[in-house]
């Protein structure tokens, strides 16, 4: 049996361990091959060291301001990847009208039709803004100029009190493991890599990825998310003002 995927591994040391355990084949032979894309030339990554953590009261206001700023910076052509429909609603309540004024259509998952319809309209527009959740973090392919800006609003951790997540945590603990390090974090890393991977789908694609969750800089586990990015990709801080220069990339 041969299993292949661009995101079987977490992108960190021991990256296949999580997938191997989940599939019941911890001793499987693994190999990680390089990408044909030149990520360091095709994309830039921006983080925001000043962004409040998601638990802070000012987070949504700052998040909304940053999303609007980034969408305006590239004139649309943006995926705004959220982790829940609640966050989508909160963003649209705050900046929905301003996003509509950027130029292209604003397509919102859960409001404007099924994911397949939103994706078709986004591709056709060329300057649209698609605000979505789980369906758009993986398995969608938009090549060319239509998608030049991927905004990750929050690290994609599972909600810990969901019954399935609680059951997985109990199983990990029963086996002597650590629910966060052995399950929640690897799952989030893979989903994060999938989200980042929406941007570069061919050797001709270019653009930016913005990570609007300061935990990648402030938390000990945050380094693993940065390590999961494509090797050699330049990373800059939005707080430094460097995001104003995206010439040739967006």
Model-derived segments and their meaning:
Residues 1-250:
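ASCE RecA-like P-loop NTPase motor cores
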